[in-house]
Amino acid sequence: MTAPKATILSSDEIRRALTRIAHEIIERNKGAENLAIIGVHTRGIPLAERLASKLSELEGVEVPRGMLDITLYRDDLSEVARQPIIRETQVPFDLADRRVILVDDVLYTGRTVRAALDALIDLGRPEGIQLAVLVDRGHRELPIRADYVGKNLPTAKHEVVKVKLQETDGTDIVELFDPEDLQ
């Protein structure tokens, strides 16, 4: 793998973006009462953990957190792998009467979010669902929009946005690549 085309967010910029998103969530929801944070595998989970911790720190209430595997809800499952890896879904609380903040790293076509919404609705009927993403790169194929965005990043369709997080990759950074640079 060669050097990235550009660094989109540094570690400090990721931290600041998540802090801003936490404040926006609190403002829109008039606090953190009745909120729950659910991260989409894989990198949505550590982002959700960080957001939940920040919300708890700012509001003084424990925000329930969960993780969602959308593998079986994807509309491209046959293209992903012959034997898809099924990860764990953990939502150890009742969704009823909660506003759920669904968290993912990158919003692109909207298909991952659509699958996450299907998976979430199968678990219960929350009061509402809001979407928080670290990067929105455009190119939507479905009518889906994030409620909270760390960075809007217009990209070419062929470009690749790579999010690396301390919990999964040992570092916090968001980089932009041309596909041939990832070979």
Swiss-Prot record:
Positions in coiled-coil regions: none
Keyword Transcription recorded: yes
Residues binding substrate, per UniProt: 42-43, 87, 104-112, 137, 161
Organism superkingdom: Bacteria
Residue ranges annotated as motif PRPP-binding: 100-112
Statement: the UniProt record of this protein carries the keyword Chloroplast: no
InterPro entries for the chain: PRibTrfase_dom, PRTase-like, PyrR, PyrR_bifunctional
SUPFAM superfamilies, per the entry: PRTase-like
Record field: catalytic activity: UMP + diphosphate = 5-phospho-alpha-D-ribose 1-diphosphate + uracil
GO molecular function term, any single one: uracil phosphoribosyltransferase activity
An annotated GO BP: regulation of DNA-templated transcription
Protein family membership: Belongs to the purine/pyrimidine phosphoribosyltransferase family. PyrR subfamily.
NCBIfam families assigned to the protein according to its UniProt record, in alphabetical order: PRK05205.1-1 (NF003545), PRK05205.1-3 (NF003547), PRK05205.1-4 (NF003548), PRK05205.1-5 (NF003549)
Role noted for this protein: Regulates the transcription of the pyrimidine nucleotide (pyr) operon in response to exogenous pyrimidines. Also displays a weak uracil phosphoribosyltransferase activity which is not physiologically significant.
HAMAP family the UniProt entry points to: PyrR (MF_01219)
Name the record gives this protein: Bifunctional protein PyrR
Organism: Deinococcus radiodurans (strain ATCC 13939 / DSM 20539 / JCM 16871 / CCUG 27074 / LMG 4051 / NBRC 15346 / NCIMB 9279 / VKM B-1422 / R1)
Gene that encodes the chain: pyrR
